[in-house]
């Protein structure tokens, strides 16, 4: 005799008194009353008869659509049970039909409701996870963009500082080419040079003096020294006492002021010219970008400028300053003079060390104590 069952969506077969659980090729039955697991149907029916006092189809049959529940059957069994006594012993026989729940669909509805709630919770959890992942991705993108902007700003600052340094250097170079006007008191030549000039019938002039004088004689015109890097040196002197005629002085003034040529105009003898050249070369102010090399180490070009030429094999590059040539020679010598004090890395140029400190150690600028002395 079969027993009623309901096939639910989660592959579980329910009876009205027990639950069939499927797992592959095997199954077992769970009692709804005490939750005991039974392996066969016979064990299940014997269990509910012995343990729970349920009889299977003893009095009459009921259809699967019976309208009363298990609680109604238990109440009827308590009120209308028939008791018979036989001999010494007594056997109680309760005629109770198999209870078929009128709320048999309750299990499937509850399971469906639980499944819906569980699925809704899972979907909500998945949505929360997706939302968190999107937020993390957006935050990571924002951090990347901020990092790129910071790097671009640092590069722009470095380029701006380099451009400012180049502008300052170019302004220094341009200012070094401006004529320097010096108005010192006059210097009288020694008696020996005056005697030599008188013997050679040369006109004696008073050369300018950079040192202070006690009482400078009032010259008729201001003497000046014009020193230009790109042109030849022009030394103009004004004699305090002129023995020649006024016409000779006018001719000499016309030669000095009228001619635009960059030549050396002097009206002194050979010994006086040598003394004037010596004083002018010794007393002129040095260029701020002048080199420490001797005059013989530089090569003068046709336009009057001095160039420092790299003498490494067949290089032959020309530089205006010796410091630039020394920096260039590092390329040939493979010397790394700029060292990082944090990681012991060495570089050929200071700009590479500055970039390394910014990117690797997040430091700005270069400490003066770690750089070699500038040329």
From Swiss-Prot:
Record field: compositional bias (Low complexity): 121-142
PROSITE patterns: ZINC_FINGER_C2H2_1, ZINC_FINGER_C2H2_2
Zinc finger intervals, C2H2-type: 29-52, 308-332, 338-361
Keywords, comma-separated and alphabetical: DNA-binding, Metal-binding, Nucleus, Repeat, Transcription, Transcription regulation, Zinc, Zinc-finger
One GO BP: regulation of transcription by RNA polymerase II
GO CC aspect terms: nucleus
Purpose of the protein: May be a transcription factor for genes having (A+T) stretches in their promoter and/or enhancer regions. Binds to AT rich DNA.
Protein name: AT-rich binding protein
Lineage: Eukaryota, Metazoa, Ecdysozoa, Arthropoda, Hexapoda
